[in-house]
């Protein structure tokens, strides 16, 4: 199990508004059988808007491959946002996202970039 925290920005797809955010969460990972350089992980991430204090969370799944000599990792991410935000994070309610996971062992950082999945079914409006 891994515990993580971070910060970054989120861009609202329809308006381009930039939201400053922090996050924390937990993930469970394991090696993929017969692919010793590949890890799967899944978990929950709490997302907090620095701008207005709004909160949300995502459930995510990742497949990450590592270079065993450098420990650099790269992979793919799928995630879905909870549908409970009421402030600046509300445009992300129920949004399905996909992206990339990049680990840099020299800086001990992970960068995750997510994009709205455009091939999904339309969400019902409240």
Explain the meaning of each model-derived region.
Residues 1-126:
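Beta-strand-enriched cores of mature, soluble protein domains
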